[in-house]
Amino acid sequence: MLSLRVTGFDLPPSFCDVNSPPPAPDQIKVRIKACGLNFADLLLLKGTYQDTPALPFTPGLEVAGEVIECGAEVFNFTPGDRVAVFCGSGGLAEEGVFEAHRAIPLPDSISYEEAAALLIAY
């Protein structure tokens, strides 16, 4: 899958083809439809955000998409569910694997783009 990767704070991010891992027992895999970008993401790219992951990493703190796989201990989501996820990183990719407790159900009345912009702002 394609993922925007940060490999150094003095280098521009670049798109890379990376493996999409299976979810752990408490995680969901999401086909990402939209990713919010905000001030915290800019700090991540500079390495100055309080929770900047170790290099290399995929930025993107908040996403919306469709669940495509659930870990064995996840009972509140099923494949096909629409969700918004405050993920902390990993959002600028085609798919992401996130802890299920960071996801909320997304009603059909909210678009993926709207949902991806809500989690940090509200």
Name each model-derived stretch.
Residues 40-46:
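Cytochrome P450 core scaffold surrounding the K-helix E-X-X-R motif
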Residues 9, 36-38, 102-104:
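Active-site/binding-pocket entry motifs
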Residues 6, 45, 68-69, 97-99:
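Short beta-strand-to-turn element immediately C-terminal to the catalytic PLP-Schiff-base lysine
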